[in-house]
Amino acid sequence: YTYRYHEEDFAKAKIPAVWYQAEGKNEILLENGQPYVTVKVVSGKLELKRVFERTEQLVPKYALREDGSAFSFEENKELIFRRIADVMSESRGEKFGFPISNILARKHFNDNSMDDERLMYEMLEMIEERYDCSDFLMCGLIRYLHNYPVEGAMKKRIKDVMLNYRYWMDMDGFDGMCFWSENHALMFYTCAMNAGEMYPDEYFPRAKMTGRELHLYGRNKVLQWLDDVEEYGFEEFLSTVYMCVTFAALINVVDYSEPEISKRAAAVTDKMLSMLALHTYKTGIVAPMGRVYRSVLYPFDQGAMALMNLINPKLPYTFGEGWLGFYASSHYPIPEGLVKLMEDDVETNHTTGNARVYLEKNDDYCLTSVASPREPFTRWENEPLRKMWISRHITLRNHLTNVFMALHILGQVHTVISSTCGMQRLTAKRAFSLHIQVLHQRRAICAQATGMEMV
């Protein structure tokens, strides 16, 4: 068994876990302060692992003075940046890390203790290969370039990578990047807007645009995103995983766009933080969410608590995937009155996306729920297109959604097999044939439902 579960720092994740022998023992005395235990059973060539969660060991983490009092906003902000800077590279599992937030935090301190030049080159390779979530890296890279000089070989490498990046799904390329979600969309849009502005006279071959054209393309997309959120609210509302990502993208828009767009992005950011503050109850965020993960079981341990701790240093903190490293170089001001929203009694409801969220909280309890679809029901208009190019990306293979797909359009449910993932008896030729059949079927159903031809 081992206590290793998830390391925030990829440098530590690469170190082999320490395994303790339990063979022949009827009971084991587990260490305090270790909330996760992974047990491994080996029989011949078979290996079975299971992670056990020790709920009583999962407790809030506070950053307070020795006398128990809270640090000031500015003091706490520096502590947050220091925690992020001390992590070499945010772990994305056991194979690689995303270092840009950590590098930004270290630049804030003029900290040269880690090999950030090597990390930058590794990061540029991930962007060039278009890893899923490489838009996160690109967004951070743009922030870096706006604040810190680069010269020589690094400057040339960055330019090559940025010119050849794929900034939206209708551009040339096939990769594992996810474009579809609310946070990813804004990341790509603002990256296109800013990258084009940085190289106005250069040609971006995947976009088939000059930098000046790409800037206008991205700017238009950012405006559409802001229009949508201002009118309908967030679709990933109150998501304690993704609000940190959206925060980072929004402050890039705040910091690196023209004044009118910057002002609108700041207002949307204010709204997002106000919603989270309203649903903060005592030591955690208690809310229905547009996208949710298992961490919701522990409200004090959710990613967005990094944002709430920034606002109110008395609250527990989390690492929040290091996203607040972006804030170290931002001029976005945290709005007044958010701590009051956290602490005051309230009984209210509000709409966001396709949901109406209800909340009642006081000193004794917090109750919250969601109605979806909400009343009144409103939905944006589809683009008036007759034809749309669709790029189906590799990420779906990893999510298994292209092994068994359920299409529920016009009351029809079609369950189909579209790849060989986990089905080794199918030959590649047969799997490809099935995949083509699926695409034709999907195209016909899509055309019937929308009047659009799917190419």
Residues covered by each model-derived region:
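Charged/polar, low-hydrophobicity segments characteristic of intrinsically disordered regions
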Residues: 132-145, 168-180, 223-240, 271-298
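Short alpha-helical patches at coil-to-helix transitions and adjacent helical residues
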Residues: 138, 185, 189, 240-247
